[in-house]
Amino acid sequence: MVNKITVVGAGNVGATTAQRLAEKQLAKVVVMVDVVEGVPQGKALDQWESAPIEGFDTRVIGTNGYEETADSDIVIITAGIARKPGMSRDDLLNTNAGIVKQVSEHVKRSSPTAIIIMVSNPLDVMAYVAKKVTGFPRERVLGMAGVLDTARYRSFIAEALDVSVEDIQAMVLGGHGDTMVPLISYTTVSGIPVTQLMDQKTLDAIVTRTRNGGAEIVKFLKTGSAYYAPSAASVQMAEAIVHDRKRVLPCAAWLEGEYGMSGLFLGVPCKLGRKGLEQIIEVELTSKERTDLGKSAEAVREPMSVLKL
């Protein structure tokens, strides 16, 4: 258990993340901060009132300022707006970049030794904004993408094969978007290569569904997006850090030559421990996987070029 974890943003993702953090007792205090008056306070109070039933002692606090977030060990950033009708991707990008920039400035001042887990979209670019604004080393700025995308991929494979999700080992690398790269060559069912259990056509359909995982949920909900799985993914990362578990999880990390790339955040296998990012693990890729990862990197770099910071 650490002393304090802050969740920035009290929308569906942020509030569900705060609840999961409290229920797992990963910190003595969980602070939920949001610009909308009353929302973080009300949701935090509601969560705290569930403590006697759920059996946790983590104090949940809601606030509109950053004073109570001071000296947080981990800051999970979920703040941002959803794309509105008539809004271009560049408009959305720069609006959310402005929000993340402001949040990052607060984090730099109030919690200068914190580890940041970025959840706001477009994920890989927002992680870059946070790193650039805070000046934090790459060990302390991570993006939550691969854990979520991998969970979706694993759940679809388990469903298709009618086996437990726990027996699916897999990894999805690359950017958090439709160019993500599920690694079929590293996908197994209790050690059995998935290619021995499933035909290529079914696998290809699952890869496509994984890439469109977020959009599929938005289509169903119509006025919202996913939050149960995204919050679970960010909390799994936080848990690995808090308990120094040395978990190997696919996360968006700042590359400095790994996989032949530098100067961007991209989903790669990361060892997470108490210091945050402890190691980027380079795995052998097929030529197609390497090509696809390169295309994914280009898709991440493109919006970085239109950023107005």
List where the protein language model places each region.
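N-terminal Rossmann-fold NAD(P) dinucleotide-binding loop
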Residues: 14-15
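Rossmann-like NAD(P)(H) cofactor-binding subdomain of soluble oxidoreductases
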Residues: 88-154
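C-terminal substrate-binding/catalytic lobe of Rossmann-fold NAD(P)-dependent dehydrogenases
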Residues: 134-139, 149-309
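Extreme N-terminal starter segment of soluble prokaryotic enzymes
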Residues: 2-5
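Glycine-rich Rossmann-fold phosphate-binding loop(s) that bind the pyrophosphate
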Residues: 10-11
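Rossmann-like NAD(P)-binding element
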Residues: 53-115
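Conserved N-terminal Rossmann-fold NAD(P) cofactor-binding segment
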Residues: 33-72, 301-309
